[in-house]
Amino acid sequence: MICRVDYGSNDEEYDGPELQVVTEEDHLLPKREYLSAAFALSGLNSRASVFDDEDYDEQGGQEKEHVPVEKSFDSEEREPVVLKEEKPVKHEKEASILGNKNQMDTGDVQEELVVGLSEATLDEKRVTPLPTLYLEDDGMVILQFSEIFAIQEPQKKRQKREIRCITYRDKYISMDISELIEDDEEVLLKSHGRIDTHGKKTDQIQLDVPLPIRERSQLVKSGIVRDTTSESREFTKLGRDSCIMGELLKQDLKDDNSSLCQSQLTMEVFPLDQQEWEHLILWEISPQFSANCCEGFKSGLESAGIMVQVRASNSVTEQESLNVMNSGGQTQGDNNNMLEPFFVNPLESFGSRGSQSTNESTNKSRHHPQLLRLESQWDEDHYRENGDAGRENLKQLNSDARGRLSGLALQDRDMWDESWLDSIIWESDKDLSRSKLIFDLQDEQMIFEVPNNKERKYLQLHAGSRIVSRSSKSKDGSFQEGCGSNSGWQFNISNDKFYMNGKSAQKLQGNAKKSTVHSLRVFHSAPAIKLQTMKIKLSNKERANFHRPKALWYPHDNELAIKQQKILPTQGSMTIVVKSLGGKGSLLTVGREESVSSLKAKASRKLDFKETEAVKMFYMGKELEDEKSLAEQNVQPNSLVHLLRTKVHLWPWAQKLPGENKSLRPPGAFKKKSDLSNQDGHVFLMEYCEERPLMLSNAGMGANLCTYYQKSSPEDQHGNLLRNQSDTLGSVIILEHGNKSPFLGEVHGGCSQSSVETNMYKAPVFPHRLQSTDYLLVRSAKGKLSLRRINKIVAVGQQEPRMEIMSPASKNLHAYLVNRMMAYVYREFKHRDRIAADELSFSFSNISDATVRKYMQVCSDLERDANGKACWSKKRKFDKIPLGLNTLVAPEDVCSYESMLAGLFRLKHLGITRFTLPASISTALAQLPDERIAAASHIARELQITPWNLSSSFVTCATQGRENIERLEITGVGDPSGRGLGFSYVRVAPKSSAASEHKKKKAAACRGVPTVTGTDADPRRLSMEAAREVLLKFNVPDEIIAKQTQRHRTAMIRKISSEQAASGGKVGPTTVGMFSRSQRMSFLQLQQQAREMCHEIWDRQRLSLSACDDDGNESENEANSDLDSFVGDLEDLLDAEDGGEGEESNKSMNEKLDGVKGLKMRRWPSQVEKDEEIEDEAAEYVELCRLLMQDENDKKKKKLKDVGEGIGSFPPPRSNFEPFIDKKYIATEPDASFLIVNESTVKHTKNVDKATSKSPKDKQVKEIGTPICQMKKILKENQKVFMGKKTARANFVCGACGQHGHMKTNKHCPKYRRNTESQPESMDMKKSTGKPSSSDLSGEVWLTPIDNKKPAPKSATKISVNEATKVGDSTSKTPGSSDVAAVSEIDSGTKLTSRKLKISSKAKPKASKVESDSPFHSLMPAYSRERGESELHNPSVSGQLLPSTETDQAASSRYTTSVPQPSLSIDKDQAESCRPHRVIWPPTGKEHSQKKLVIKRLKEITDHDSGSLEETPQFESRKTKRMAELADFQRQQRLRLSENFLDWGPKDDRKWRKEQDISTELHREGKVRRAYDDSTVSEERSEIAESRRYREVIRSEREEEKRRKAKQKKKLQRGILENYPPRRNDGISSESGQNINSLCVSDFERNRTEYAPQPKRRKKGQVGLANILESIVDTLRVKEVNVSYLFLKPVTKKEAPNYLEIVKCPMDLSTIRDKVRRMEYRDRQQFRHDVWQIKFNAHLYNDGRNLSIPPLADELLVKCDRLLDEYRDELKEAEKGIVDSSDSLR
């Protein structure tokens, strides 16, 4: 029965049986409208409802005796509290509790009730039916319970309530409480009704009466409440979120009384929704009450619907309930201090049932919905009890009780039966402890939602349960539910499956059948998610052995490291790198006299092996002896020693699994890289049947093993048995009878198939029996060998890809590279603030510099460190690393990228470098002639079976359903087995158009070859006799033919022809194929045919890879033979490793093998493979340098200077590195030693063009600042072919010489200011035609084959200075042309060929052309800031001659290009002026273009005051000798630059690299520097290089001149003819005219003092002085930058505001340089005075201010004096020339 009570008004109502159920809306009403939660909690305390908010079973404080209690219960004679009444009770009528005049508050009503129970009832000695309340003073009756139950008809409502709660019964009925209650809580619900309580002397009876309570009212206590100590008042409470129901589950209740457990198990308590409690309501059938009922109880308690519960408790106060203590109801007892439990059921009559029925009905009514509503509204803060306030309220209650309760009416008198006392539930004096709610994050069945913060990221990585966030979404944007529908939120709490229409449900069900529920979630380890186990860049060896990684079992010597080990610093102790075969290296410092045993002892600490363990050390392929010292065995400093460990350790406990508290699978397991080890856990070996699987997982990536079982019938339960078997692979997935197979093949009914599934692919696996002798050998990075058992071994079938592999030059590839770079940068920024720019360029070489800058500007700034190297510095504001860093690049994307690299590497070795779309391949093949179709078909086949094409084809067809598998070839070129055991994922070529078909038929008809379609040969046109002859050819008997008509003969011919053509018969003019007809099939027939083909291939693959039954019956001989073959293969591999990779080692090894084993064939590596090995060795050497150059102290203290030292793993700059280059790449001919052709190996690789933007200062000077830059430069020159871009200067045409690329005012023009009378004939490209041709404008270079049939030597020798002199002497005698040969490597495949440059007096265009892809190479000597000296690339010719890679061009090995050379019979001035300067532009070929050749004229610096040289043969010899010297010097410089890509400049020149950053650093400090102008710095460097170079030339020339003068004993007068600008038509003169002109010039030179007019002289001495002083200034600015950096530029006002006020004559080096260029200095003293002025100004301004600056100025003047003294002779001659010039002018 449910009653609604409104205590806010004086009227109550009773709604009858059609009551409304309490809902959650009731809780939102004001507190004054409803009954307080105190009564509800008091009534439900013993029941521990599921919805209870407080825990009342906790143990209270120690109970004390209560003094006011004088009476106790008697065991024999006991006075019941409730009296019995015989009058009938009517339940339909209700009376008012309060009158309209006087409304009492909660405290008043409570006081009156307490007094009644305390004073009146316990004085009576006889049993009364129901209790009666009396006044304490006069004993007047206040309330009788009999009157409460006497009202039979409900009264109408007197006034409207303020707020009425509307409840809905249906809603409550729909709530199934059984779903909220688990099985283990059911016992508790049935047993918590009875709790025994032990009381010592005073057991209180509490009457819990809910009354209206106002916000600030206080509870009144009387009797025992008044004298209760503070200890008894304390009561342990739980929070609102606690659940009392679960308390007994913790087994914390300690009770010695066994009756408690018995009472809990005997009682039956059912939830409210499981019992029909409405049938238990009594309507007008209550029994009669006795006449002895007291008349005192006249209260409206029953009309208010109050459930009265009387219970005994040792606690005094409960803050959540109103306790009414009855001290008078206690009786004395001799041996029993405990009251029997009893319970009052206010919903039915007390006399209608016995004790058992009463208990049952009481327990059934305990879960009253009204009580649930009332208990949630309790607020304990409003019901604090106060003793003093209680006494005052009690007095007020006693005085006004009669008037306040006079309006109460009697309603019911059903409490006479004392059987209800047996139902009283007594509270225990021991409290139950608080239950602990445990959230297990490792429970995989749990799902927790956490906010988007840092804790979510941590929990997702470490928790075994699922951690989700409301704002997060899965990668595909949706969350798949088990019902197959996508909900708006992840948990799909809206039950969308019940609201779907039929069509959508059927569609989703169909899609679910296609995928058949088998998508398991794959977890990766934390290192794999962070990409810690994956390399950023794969080496060539790793790409070549991508599918079969090659382990190193024999020490391999690095040739590059061997060549460089002597060059590295060797002072002090000797450093040695000890490296294990596992790849771990360690740097050790030892003495040269130490033994190998000492070295092993030191290495044992680093490589974790015991000193007693037997290990071997190898150096240069030889094993080192322990007793001898390192010096005796010729171990050089900075060398690499390999450590070989031979002891095998056993792991008997490797099978153990982690403990119970540790997770066995990600993300809870494998959180560190050290966890990814074979030291523990189970090991499965899987071998792929494919030679090159499409995709492979990296270390740390997860995979799911599962077994699919196909039901043979709907009743088949064998799949459940598989789940219980221990030998089943992975989880078992049962396929229903109608489900489709998850593989291309069909899984037969009643059979199972295991598979391995990842996010990338799915492949079937076939278990094999593991031999007892099979073990796994594990080698660690430090070389330790261990042996452990293997759990299982399986063979993996063909992969079915689930994702597409990246294709080259696609948007996905670009996005991946950018994301990979940013993920790397973000992770690096977590640990450091700077990343070297070279590091990103080297690690991500496929990304252009512009792209790198674009994305790096978001989080960093490009700066320069203290060493002047560019680096990316993290922005200060960029402190937040993106939360989705782990999802930026998925591990599957890395595997896809690596698979693409492996495919590209294979195509590269096949010679395929250009790619096209698969759709255009068939179109291209149709247009090729027949003789080229075979080669083109091979290329097309290789392009079709690339990983990206195969995966794309399969994924496209599979996503549309297995029904579309007919779009694949299934059989053909894509079969990885090559013999019908695998599927071909090549997509079927689209049908050709009708026009192409018609063209093919027409072409076939022209060739006389019939087609198979039958359209060209119609048997219906045959006559009877012709048809008879055809049938006779078909071996049809003549008797049968004679009986047939023409129509029958035609049908027979067509039938037999079609059958034989379908069976593979030949097609020809005389065969039956000419009459065949193709059979057309429907789409369903094609699907069925494809399905049958898949089943056949699947069955063959399954039988081939499954373990045979007779594997265990293998004989020992067969096993031994397999072992012998394995040993033989292993020996061959070791021999190959021992033989080395170089040519010499191969030759020596072959000689040994020939002598021992006879003829042995060995595959010689191709040139591409050699280049790849060189590149890998260079990368290994970089790592070796990192170990050699690192400082151990800095490493320990972690104070490495900067990341700008390379990649962070690259060595710092060194000044004494010797260049390295393979000798076979540089070769010169003896007759042309001064012409060095820049050669490189052109390899067919895919071009990844990088849009590099360089500053103006980098356009002329190419800086090699770090080892990465040098290695990148060499790799670019040796491996990649770049397209040269024609500059705007190429459109210029010189008006003097007619050449392209410059104007006539350019000082590099051959005819710049040249004397017109002595001008030789100009060599230009328009010489043969008279005007520039189109080929000239396009920059084509014409090459002429040399008629010399003598082959050029394969290995050319170097030229010395003496040989060059001889060549010069021999060539000086003939004025004709000379042939100059140079070697260039032509990469058309892998063949090395040579080219010749023919230097002649005129150009001859020929038919052969040279094309180039290389960038523009300036052949002018460039200054290298690393070397600090000029690099004379070539005084005349430099560049590359790279012919095209066509087969016919590769066959020819010699070409010549016409390069002008001056006649050697003219004098020095003519020879100087005729020095060639040409720009030979590359051709504009479409496919193959070669490098550009730039031939620039060297700058002329001569002394005009010396006498003119005589035109003698000795001068020509001297000129040639000088050119040879320059060539030899240039060759040495180029060797230093090209032999070693780790070329570091000298110590002093490293300061030049710092110059770029000097201005920036000084600007930051606010001192006296500022940035250089880029263009000015570039000009300075070029001028410095030229001045230094020509100074050496002039010095050598003068020394030769002095020796010649001593021999001839006569003086030579030096002079220079004035050069006048030539006319435009000078270059068109004929050769005969040129000879005459030369003769005239020679005569004129001999007699010029007599006949020639006085020419206009230049300031020859002043120019020489200016050149020398400028070189001194440049030396001070560049070489001595550590001294002069403060005096480079004028002091600005910003740097020193009062500088000009103190210093009246400011001076700086830039001002001095400008004065030198304006030729303002007449002698050296003026120059020195200005430098002294700098010193004076520094002392004048900085003395007393900046004490560190004046010493620098003093040192600057000292260095200037030293330089002036060094150039003393030259300055003296120049000053003398100035004096002579001034004298002559006077």
Curated annotation (Swiss-Prot):
InterPro entries to which the protein is assigned, alphabetical: Bromodomain (IPR001487), Bromodomain-like_sf (IPR036427), Bromodomain_CS (IPR018359), TAF1 (IPR040240), TAF1_HAT_dom (IPR022591), Ubiquitin-like_dom (IPR000626), Ubiquitin-like_domsf (IPR029071)
Reported phenotype of the disruption mutant: Plants show reduced acetylation of histone H3 in light-responsive promoters, decreased chlorophyll accumulation and altered expression of about 9% of genes in young leaves.
GO process terms (BP): response to light stimulus
Coiled-coil residues: 1591-1620, 1752-1786
Record bears the keyword Coiled coil: yes
Disordered: region residues: 54-83, 350-372, 1303-1382, 1397-1471, 1596-1634
Pfam families: Bromodomain (PF00439), DUF3591 (PF12157), ubiquitin (PF00240)
GO cellular component: transcription factor TFIID complex
Annotated ranges, domain Bromo: 1656-1774
Compositionally biased residues, Polar residues: 352-362, 1357-1377, 1433-1464
Domain Ubiquitin-like residue range list: 574-650
Sequence similarity: Belongs to the TAF1 family.
Protein name: Transcription initiation factor TFIID subunit 1b
Species in which this protein is naturally found: Arabidopsis thaliana (Mouse-ear cress)
Gene behind this protein: TAF1B
